């Protein structure tokens, strides 16, 4: 017998009162019980839920995360090895050399890189990501990365990740040989919306880098930014794109409009809409590490951070981001302690 709780009137129901299964009831069976992620059409239904069902969604997303990922939260810190001067035109990014942004090109020295890794490890983090604002690494950058990784390994017990743009097959092998644990390269948005965000390279070029990274044995980190003008349909498409890729980690960023960039005048995503996206992406990716990344402070604030961690998130970036300020590491760690969520241990990350 179908109960009233399991069905709701369809938005497309005709005068005959046709009903369809409630999407959250479907998700409980499909995702929570069987561990099968929602498809694109189903994710769209979740994104279209009314605001009065947000808490119900977040509770379900948290239950899914606890069942299929467990209670541990992975903590990561990031550092910019090479800041600014990027030749690409990613419309959200203040590090592009094509825009009138206040960010200027600069390199970080190896001792500063090691010190940042030490401070990251002291926070309880197990992952330290070295980032460079480039289309892809040249010989000089790869040499700096190699020296930095070696210096960090000699002094700090932490996994090292990298985010260096698009790679050649040879560069992928070089990074794997350096011992890079995880490689980040975000698809940023749905395939159908990508040309509204970037025009100097293609979505397919990014995808190719990610598949080569996986084939080389490194973990794949791939997410994007929500709130760049995409429709709910495209947001659902993006979740499906990520599910097809099946990365080890998905960082969810929320647009923090930067002065001087083409997206500098966009509105910040409403908190409820951002949290609904968090829950929807968890239901699409039940077994994937889902990380709170940039923009959550301006979009969600302190209360939103708690609701997100109780709504499907199981990883965080602590401290500052590349060109914007983040929450203090102590604030996130205190929140996790209050919620009695253990930090992922280093040996569990290897």
UniProtKB/Swiss-Prot annotation:
Disulfide bonds: none annotated. [2Fe-2S] cluster binds at residues 129, 162, 221, 291. Homodimer. It comes from the Bacteria. Catalyzes the conversion of dethiobiotin (DTB) to biotin by the insertion of a sulfur atom into dethiobiotin via a radical-based mechanism. The gene is bioB. Residues 71-296 form the Radical SAM core domain. Binds 1 [4Fe-4S] cluster. The cluster is coordinated with 3 cysteines and an exchangeable S-adenosyl-L-methionine. It is an enzyme of class 2 (transferase). It catalyses: (4R,5S)-dethiobiotin + (sulfur carrier)-SH + 2 reduced [2Fe-2S]-[ferredoxin] + 2 S-adenosyl-L-methionine = (sulfur carrier)-H + biotin + 2 5'-deoxyadenosine + 2 L-methionine + 2 oxidized [2Fe-2S]-[ferredoxin]. Pathway: Cofactor biosynthesis; biotin biosynthesis; biotin from 7,8-diaminononanoate: step 2/2. It comes from Mycobacterium ulcerans (strain Agy99). Keywords: 2Fe-2S, 4Fe-4S, Biotin biosynthesis, Iron, Iron-sulfur, Metal-binding, S-adenosyl-L-methionine, Transferase. Residues 1-20 are annotated as: Disordered. Its EC number is 2.8.1.6. This is Biotin synthase. PANTHER family: BIOTIN SYNTHASE, BIOTIN SYNTHASE, MITOCHONDRIAL. Residues 1-13 have a biased composition (Polar residues). GO terms for biological process: biotin biosynthetic process. It holds the Pfam family BATS. PROSITE patterns: RADICAL_SAM (PS51918).
